[in-house]
Amino acid sequence: MKILFVAAEGAPFSKTGGLGDVIGALPKSLVKAGHEVAVILPYYDMVEAKFGNQIEDVLHFEVSVGWRRQYCGIKKTVLNGVTFYFIDNQYYFFRGHVYGDFDDGERFAFFQLAAIEAMERIDFIPDLLHVHDYHTAMIPFLLKEKYRWIQAYEDIETVLTIHNLEFQGQFSEGMLGDLFGVGFERYADGTLRWNNCLNWMKAGILYANRVSTVSPSYAHEIMTSQFGCNLDQILKMESGKVSGIVNGIDADLYNPQTDALLDYHFNQEDLSGKAKNKAKLQERVGLPVRADVPLVGIVSRLTRQKGFDVVVESLHHILQEDVQIVLLGTGDPAFEGAFSWFAQIYPDKLSTNITFDVKLAQEIYAACDLFLMPSRFEPCGLSQMMAMRYGTLPLVHEVGGLRDTVRAFNPIEGSGTGFSFDNLSPYWLNWTFQTALDLYRNHPDIWRNLQKQAMESDFSWDTACKSYLDLYHSLVN
């Protein structure tokens, strides 16, 4: 099968979050499974700086963006068997960052038009075209409404993956003519209109042949008013083509037996290296080196979406216990300030690190006993899977991908891979935290068994790849 991915970011070239991880990993697994895979990405200035000498020029042409004719260069490289094509236009993509400009609508309108028009020129007409989030969600609409006259594109099947429904691409309806060069019929009849705006995500949901999300629970949640971000009724209407597939993690990269960022290696049969990493981390972040105290890790953006309003409200109560917490992250200044204040009050119990440090993050995943992740909503989440890979048990709010990946501790069977609570409140966070502390202190054999189960969980991309192939084969015979 010929499969083409079109996305706004993709590791290792450009990455701001989980979308970049998916584009870096899923195509590689599909190639291993025997398929021909290509990816189209914007050619950002950070790609030029880091990988420019590995990328070759292929061709160039002009794209009509409304009444304007814009330069479009095509560049190319091959990595892990995947052919990466880059759309080059320095005006749109040499901004020093991926998102956040006032003209993001124009930038990604150009990108989508260029990606479609590039397919014939690079001689890669896919059986299946997989687009991601709002930045590329107009492509299924454009294929059926603007480019339907191109015979080579007639049989292309499309999949839209929603990584985060909060970001929908809502713009003025004038964009249809001014940028995309199409008429207003589909806006006037309500197909593309939402809240009196042009909604790219709605267009993708309605026009793609299949819609996937990054976990089965999130696929269900976005059809409710609580999580549907005002598109729940549209998703319910299209529910027959909506499904969820849990993202994977790179099992080779996140491997406690070989991780180059760790001082000591270990496996599920011998956790002595994990204990040494714990002592090393305690020393590094300025906490007393104690093997007996439960060490709790947090690696996150400090935002309300991640549940940190509830964490801050619970923190004084939690720190009354004989525990240690090491936090790594940046975000809302109010939360940054709260954690810094608590670290001054409890210097032997809380280490606050308001920064981003890849090595420290890896050490937290590997060295801690518990990993706190009480997100208000979480489409998939990767941190909980990384933590489990290293025998660090997650304590999570039961939503989205957290519900699908963390098996809550069952005291009757002594089974599970972590701890979870259903109602996001200080009471239930504290109650679940007490359950975990009791198990850690008084039932070490059960704790050890949970660690083993967590480390044996299969979150590899090869497993996720099989689910995506089932989805693709439902469209392409």
From Swiss-Prot:
It comes from Streptococcus pneumoniae serotype 4 (strain ATCC BAA-334 / TIGR4). Pfam families: Glyco_transf_5, Glycos_transf_1. Synthesizes alpha-1,4-glucan chains using ADP-glucose. It catalyses: [(1->4)-alpha-D-glucosyl](n) + ADP-alpha-D-glucose = [(1->4)-alpha-D-glucosyl](n+1) + ADP + H(+). ADP-alpha-D-glucose binds at residue 15. InterPro entries: Glyco_trans_1, GS/SS, Starch_synth_cat_dom. Its EC number is 2.4.1.21. Pathway: Glycan biosynthesis; glycogen biosynthesis. It is an enzyme of class 2 (transferase). GO terms for biological process: glycogen biosynthetic process. This is Glycogen synthase. It comes from the Bacteria. GO terms for molecular function: alpha-1,4-glucan glucosyltransferase (ADP-glucose donor) activity; alpha-1,4-glucan glucosyltransferase (UDP-glucose donor) activity. Keywords: Glycogen biosynthesis, Glycosyltransferase, Transferase. Belongs to the glycosyltransferase 1 family. Bacterial/plant glycogen synthase subfamily.
